[in-house]
Swiss-Prot record:
Protein name: Adenosylhomocysteinase
Record CDD domains: SAHH
Catalysed reaction equations from the record: S-adenosyl-L-homocysteine + H2O = L-homocysteine + adenosine
Molecular function via GO: adenosylhomocysteinase activity
Cofactor notes: Binds 1 NAD(+) per subunit.
Binding site for substrate: T60, D132, E157, K187, D191
Enzyme class name: hydrolase
């Protein structure tokens, strides 16, 4: 089927920002040696020749390096933002001006613009979709079923997006393969834990200039992202409380040395609240009502639904911006609640997102997942697919090599031992 041509070539803030973006993209590339090796191979082999690809991602310097690698591999690609507040406008400008990649992303774009960009992405009639929260895939299956035959597959690297894809599959609407990048060892062990841990606190500090030492920080959720946030907050001198709904991670948090309690109790004690659950309304009106005056709330989960901001706005008698990306909600009782980044991803709304070195592995997974889909076109069943173990291991090997770290290999005796059942006590 012939693709419907996209009428606009791009929708960005200011193309004159390209030189600044180029400089920052090149700086990020210094910390992304694994993706660099993949890009160089793609440039020679052109695995995506003839493939139309849409990426819905945070438009950052790291994402730019992924987009450049896919472009080098021959992809006819288009990039849109996965979050209205996460776009780095100079990066978007550079991709358009220097690489000819159509980008539809403006920092601070409203929801109408965001959804229009999703529709423009689907007008590209993609064969491969790189999604970040599964908004493009969800729109495709709801509104563009006539395009399903174009799809080779999708990749997804967020916990939130994986939950949505599994729900789609259970409802019988996911009719093509989806690569679960999020659960790759070289993604969630590092991106979710070390990336989220560092960048979340970076966002809070940039937005507030607050001292974390001595503060009580409440971390909602103790998955890999929550573990990273709690670990880094503790390391900066905070007293950390963890809230959970699942007994297993709750025990883990307690054994890691954190206080664990329900949000209803933690709400009285916290100075700063960070949600990392991927679920809805983790912080609600009953929690706002008992928080300290000046309590800070923010989110590091994917969507802006973890904090019930609608209810907070309805309660507030006044809302005012007190710093960039930071709003003060003044309640009828005179107390105030501080919200960072409109309840969206604080690390991208108020900072630059994860460090390049950790995104190197995540985006290596994305690039190789796309290649896996193309190489196995028509052979993968609809539904969720894991990153092949050999791909995960190769990414880890390349990263170790780039870090100058050597490890041991099994001796022949050890290989024989682990493959034998005969040796006992």
């Amino acid at each position: 089927m012939v693709a419907t041509p996209v009428k606009q070539k791009y929708d960005i803030k200011d193309i004159s920002l390209a030189p600044q973006g180029r400089q920052r993209i090149e700086w990020a590339a210094r910390e992304m040696p694994v993706l660099k090796q993949i890009r160089e191979r793609f440039a020679q082999e052109k695995p995506f020749a003839g493939i139309r690809l849409v990426a819905c991602c945070h438009v950052t310097t790291e994402t730019a390096n992924l987009a450049i690698a896919l472009h080098a591999g021959g992809a006819d690609s288009l990039l849109i933002a996965s979050n209205p507040l996460s776009t780095q406008d100079d990066v978007a400008a550079c991709l358009v001006a220097d690489y000819g990649i159509p980008v539809y992303a403006i920092k601070g774009e409203d929801n109408e613009t965001y959804h229009r960009h999703v529709q423009i992405a689907l007008d590209h009639r993609p064969n491969i979709i790189i999604d970040d929260g599964s908004d493009v895939v969800a729109t495709l299956v709801q509104e563009r079923q006539h395009q399903l035959s174009d799809i080779i597959g999708t990749t997804e690297e967020t916990t939130t997006g994986i939950v949505r894809l599994r729900a789609m599959f259970n409802d019988g609407v996911l009719t093509f393969p989806a690569m679960n990048v999020n659960d790759a060892d070289t993604k969630h062990f590092y991106d979710n834990r070390y990336g989220t841990g560092q960048s979340t606190l970076d966002g809070i500090i940039r937005a507030t200039n607050i001292l974390l030492a001595g503060k009580t920080i409440v971390v909602a959720g103790y998955g890999w992202c929550g573990k990273g946030v709690a670990m880094r907050a503790k390391g900066m001198g905070a007293d950390v409380i963890v809230t959970e709904i699942s007994p297993v991670p709750a025990i883990e948090a307690a054994m890691d040395g954190f206080r664990v309690m329900p949000m209803a109790e933690a709400a009285h004690q916290g100075d700063i609240f960070i949600t990392v659950t991927g679920n809805k309304h983790v912080i609600r009106p009953e929690h706002f009502a008992v928080m300290k005056d000046g309590a800070i709330v923010c989110n590091s989960g994917h969507f802006d639904i973890e904090i019930d901001l609608k209810s907070l706005k309805e309660q507030a008698k006044e809302v005012k911006e007190v710093r960039n990306f930071t709003e003060q909600y003044i309640l009828p009782n005179g107390k105030s609640i501080i919200v960072i980044g409109e309840g969206r991803l604080v690390n991208l709304a108020a900072a630059e997102g994860h460090p390049s070195a950790v995104m190197d592995m995540s985006f290596a997974n994305q690039a190789l997942a796309c290649e896996h889909l193309v190489k196995n076109k028509g052979q993968l069943e609809p539904g969720m697919h894991s990153i092949p173990v050999e791909v995960d291991q190769e990414i880890a090997r390349l990263k170790l090599q780039a870090m100058g770290i050597a490890i041991d290999s099994l001796t022949p005796e050890q290989v024989e031992y682990i493959n034998s059942w005969a040796s006992g006590t």
